[in-house]
Regions:
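Short, well-formed alpha-helical segments that are part of the catalytic scaffolds
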Residues: 12-27
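A conserved acidic beta->alpha catalytic loop
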Residues: 22, 38-48
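Glycine-rich, basic loop-to-helix element that forms the pyrophosphate-binding segment
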Residues: 61-78
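Short aromatic/hydrophobic "clamp" motif used to bind/position activated sugar donors
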Residues: 83
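Conserved donor NDP-sugar-binding/catalytic core segment of glycosyltransferases
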Residues: 93-127
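Short, flexible, basic/aromatic active-site loop/helix in glycosyltransferases
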Residues: 130-172
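A short, conserved alpha-helix in the catalytic core of glycosyltransferases
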Residues: 165-167, 173-191, 195-224
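Active-site-adjacent helix/loop segment of glycosyltransferases
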Residues: 207-277
């Protein structure tokens, strides 16, 4: 079997080498032929040379028409029966490629990994949200209503626990687009990515389209992959506007008039549904009895990054949260029910 890693790059050479090296190592461990196809969007000769020096098998220089266009170009040129469609700011942990391929062999049409924030793979990124209009309405109401938030907290944490503690590939309603594993036949069946999305929501739209046509999406819990998101876009001017424009395009094209009216009517500012203790700038998070540590930029904790039974969050991640005024929360499961045992933030005037 030949497996092609298709990577869309934009001034990404400083992170691409780890992506390529770790992929080749894990492809060898999985005993498959490996190919790396890089689509370079920087339109910069020096950057093109740096990517070429990394040793990719195919280097495609293309004008920057967006991430979806890059994926389509790379997939068309790739020679593998299985394609890993990827951001460059990822690193494969041991066993990850084997676990992704196992998910495909088990009959899932699209398979994604468990993403981790840190080098050790302990701080876990949240699974992708269900993009259906009904699920989006539920999230909107939870953000606005403390009563609904409390009533649905257990279900939200149960799902996080189900995925973060799993070992096999599980069915899910959505996947994160930093790495998607598909066969060439699957990509042909569901069509190319919509190049009307320059950045953000292109994978959401493609997965929603595939799911509505019967695709099975698999979350390969045994495939752990580090994702250092934002290396290229970071906090660049216009990033938030681009994401919002893509979101609006997705809603306009995929939700019917009734759902669009419902979501507009239910929108509004988020609530703070639990007591959050505000800490001094240099104060650490107190110890707490828990099964999950959760961290989110939102007071309602959705979505949340987390760790499972680690005792404490890694210091580097605490510093990350402190610098951004994120909310940290401790959650304990007892007799099948969840409760928040503490919540803290470093934000001075609200979260």
């Amino acid at each position: 079997m030949k497996v092609s890693l298709v990577v869309v790059c934009h001034h990404s050479s400083r992170v691409l080498s780890q992506c390529v090296e770790s992929f080749r190592r894990e492809a060898a461990a999985a005993v498959v032929d490996a190919e790396v196809v890089a689509v370079e969007h920087s339109e910069d000769a020096a950057e093109l040379a740096r990517v070429e020096a990394i040793g990719v098998d195919r280097l495609l220089e293309r004008p920057n028409r967006g991430y979806a266009a890059g994926l389509n170009s790379g997939a068309a040129e790739a020679g593998g029966e299985v394609l890993l469609l990827a951001n460059p700011d990822i690193r494969f942990f041991p066993g990850s490629v084997s676990a992704l391929l196992d998910g495909v062999e088990r009959g899932f049409d699209v398979v994604g990994p468990q993403f981790a924030w840190d080098d050790d793979g302990h701080v876990l990124l949240p699974a992708a949200e269900d993009p259906s209009p009904r699920a989006e309405f539920g999230r909107t109401i939870r953000r606005r209503s403390p009563r609904v938030w409390s009533a649905t907290l257990g279900r939200v944490l149960d799902e996080a626990w189900r995925l973060w503690t799993a070992e096999e590939t599980l069915p899910v309603a959505g996947l994160r687009g930093a790495l998607l594993t598909v066969t060439r036949e699957t990509l042909s069946r569901f069509g190319p990515f919509d190049e009307g999305y320059f950045l953000y929501y292109e994978e959401t739209e493609w997965l929603w389209r595939a799911r509505r046509r019967g695709a099975r999406l698999g979350f390969a819990a045994g495939a752990r992959v580090q994702h250092r998101w934002g290396h290229s876009i970071g906090q660049s001017d216009g990033a938030a506007d681009r994401e919002e424009n893509s979101r609006r395009r997705f809603v306009a094209r995929n939700y019917g008039p009734m759902w669009r009216r419902i979501l507009r009517a239910s929108g509004g500012s988020s609530c703070e549904p639990m007591q959050v203790v505000r800490l001094g700038d240099e104060t650490g998070v107190p110890q707490a009895e828990n099964d999950l540590w959760l961290a989110s930029q939102f007071p309602h904790l959705v979505p949340a990054i987390g760790t499972v039974r680690t005792g404490a969050m890694p210091a580097a991640f605490l510093d990350f949260c402190r610098a951004r005024g994120w909310v940290m929360a401790s959650a304990k499961r007892s007799d099948g029910k969840w409760r928040i045992t503490g919540a803290w933030t470093w934000a001075g005037d609200g979260v």
